From Swiss-Prot:
GO CC field: cytoplasm
Pfam families in UniProt: ACPS
Name used for this protein in its record: Holo-[acyl-carrier-protein] synthase
Cofactor: Mg(2+)
Family: Belongs to the P-Pant transferase superfamily. AcpS family.
Compartment(s) where it occurs, according to its Swiss-Prot or TrEMBL record: Cytoplasm
């Protein structure tokens, strides 16, 4: 396996909160996958600030992932097709669905993700990995 791409994103939590308020909550439904949406609602019910921070980290994760795989937010990379979930240990991991999952599987691409947030910002870093020949072809190093 070799690095296919890396991506990072920094989201301003207050900006995410403003968009959420302006859209009457529809922003969360547009951006979050079904499992993420359940966690968002549960966290927001306990603490508005923690719910918004969760949304900011997941928005940031989708942006960083889209950069790592080199697609940006273009098909098959869609907001809801990628979810960042947490293992019982707290470790984040990504789960793709639908056409994005098929696109990743066809290339053997996997990813590692880390997310963090403080009061004002959420940050994500993603490393996408692929078989050596796939990564080399993307970088232009293939013969």
């Amino acid at each position: 396996m070799a690095i296919y791409g890396i991506g990072t994103d920094l989201a301003q939590v207050s900006r995410i909160a403003a968009v959420l308020e302006r859209t009457g909550g529809r922003f969360a439904e547009k951006v979050l996958g079904p499992d993420e949406l359940r966690v968002f609602h549960a966290r927001r019910a306990r603490s508005e600030a923690r719910g918004i921070a969760f949304l900011a980290t997941r928005f940031s994760a989708k942006e960083a992932f889209s950069k790592a795989i080199g697609l940006g937010m273009h098909w098959p990379m869609t907001w809801r097709a990628l979810q960042t979930l947490n293992r019982p240990s707290g470790e984040p991991y990504v789960v793709a669905s639908g056409e994005l999952a098929a696109w990743l599987d066809a290339r053997g691409i996997t990813a590692r993700v880390t997310v963090s947030d403080e009061r004002d910002y959420a940050v994500t870093f993603v490393v996408a990995e692929a078989p050596d020949d796939v990564a080399a072809a993307r970088s232009g190093a293939a013969s």
